[in-house]
């Protein structure tokens, strides 16, 4: 097993209190496993995202609330657990860890129970993702693969629907699917090029 590489990570935990724990367990019972009783996951894949905005602080504040806002109807109808991710990468490449890596975050339909989520601050038009974020994501993927050798896949959020049919994908609600475009094929290609030696798989359609 390779040594876990040193990586500068800033711990900035969001609220993961009894309210979030209860909502996380309820979400798992509804969507993944009726017998679920905890928030722990066994990481088997990494999902990269972008936030859709330009501020790490704004994203952190949004994720910090345990309960989803009712106006996000499609998501809220599928459970009141707020969205979040284990990591948030700022535009300068600073890596923020928002919760323990093996606690479940709600970031990707069907895969939350096996996936570590990495949100990148930005969006395609106003705040295009940066070279520093490419480097940071690649370093973080390398760190996570060394720490959790069972990780086999690296995908972009826009690729997650192609995982349906794979054993990792579990979603008990056949109608709960969301279309995503983040972070996009160009960003994924850049990150994948930097970690190609790890041999991580993509979603079936992205190989």
Give the location of each predicted region.
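N-terminal catalytic cores of peptidoglycan-degrading enzymes
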Residues: 1-108
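Basic/polar, cationic surfaces and motifs that engage anionic cell-wall
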Residues: 1-23, 124-207
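Solvent-exposed, acidic/flexible segments
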Residues: 41, 80, 111, 126-134
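Conserved, mostly hydrophobic/aromatic
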Residues: 48, 118, 157
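Hydrophobic/aromatic pocket-lining and membrane-interface residues
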Residues: 87, 118, 137
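Substrate-binding clefts and substrate-entry loops adjacent to catalytic sites
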Residues: 104, 117-129
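Short coil-to-beta-strand
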Residues: 109-117
């Amino acid at each position: 097993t390779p040594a876990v590489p040193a990586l500068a990570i800033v711990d900035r935990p969001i609220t993961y209190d009894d309210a979030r724990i209860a909502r996380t367990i309820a979400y798992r019972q509804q969507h993944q496993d009726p017998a679920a009783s905890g928030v722990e996951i066994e990481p088997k894949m990494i999902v990269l995202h972008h936030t859709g905005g330009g501020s790490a602080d704004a994203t952190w504040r949004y994720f910090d609330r345990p309960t989803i806002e009712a106006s996000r109807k499609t998501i809220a109808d599928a459970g009141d657990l707020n969205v979040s991710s284990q990591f948030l990468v700022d535009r300068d490449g600073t890596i923020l860890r928002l919760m323990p890596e093996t606690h479940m975050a709600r970031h990707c339909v069907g895969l939350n129970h096996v996936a570590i989520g990495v949100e990148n601050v930005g969006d395609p038009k106003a705040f295009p993702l940066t070279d520093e974020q490419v480097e940071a994501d690649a370093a973080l993927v390398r760190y996570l693969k060394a720490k959790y050798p069972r990780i086999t896949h690296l995908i972009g959020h826009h690729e997650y629907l192609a995982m349906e049919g794979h054993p990792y994908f579990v979603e008990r609600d056949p109608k709960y699917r969301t279309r995503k475009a983040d972070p996009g094929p160009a960003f994924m290609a850049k990150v994948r090029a930097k970690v190609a030696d790890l041999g991580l798989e993509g979603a079936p359609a992205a190989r």
